[in-house]
């Protein structure tokens, strides 16, 4: 079920338009765990693919949540390698809907 998180960040008030509500799906308790962001190109070379998958897998096994935008390429590889249940996706969805449907999601997803 999609739920909302109401939040207030004073620094955002200087902007004309900013999100006042975040929508999320999944395990909110993942936000309390150690996190690292893995993002990168949508068209990685083979070396980058291998390195991203190995890094995400090892960090996930160590209890670190992988935070990424969920886009195709490096972002999606990181989520897949982390086993998805230990990942957090932060996204403003547009053209990456297909990537989300490819992943058997069991972690935490938020969008504004």
Task: Show which residues each predicted segment covers.
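Glycine-biased, small-residue-rich flexible motifs in mid-sequence functional cores and linkers
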Residues: 2-112
């Amino acid at each position: 079920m999609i739920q909302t998180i109401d939040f207030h960040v004073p620094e955002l008030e200087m902007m004309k338009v900013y999100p006042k509500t975040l929508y999320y799906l999944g395990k909110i308790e993942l936000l309390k765990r150690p996190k690292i962001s893995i993002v990168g190109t949508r068209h990685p070379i083979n070396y980058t693919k291998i390195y991203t998958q190995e890094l995400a897998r090892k960090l996930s096994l160590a209890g670190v949540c992988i935070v990424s935008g969920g886009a195709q390429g490096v972002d999606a590889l990181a989520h897949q390698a982390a086993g998805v249940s230990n990942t957090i996706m932060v996204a403003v969805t547009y053209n990456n809907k297909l990537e989300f449907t490819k992943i058997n999601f069991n972690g935490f997803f938020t969008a504004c």
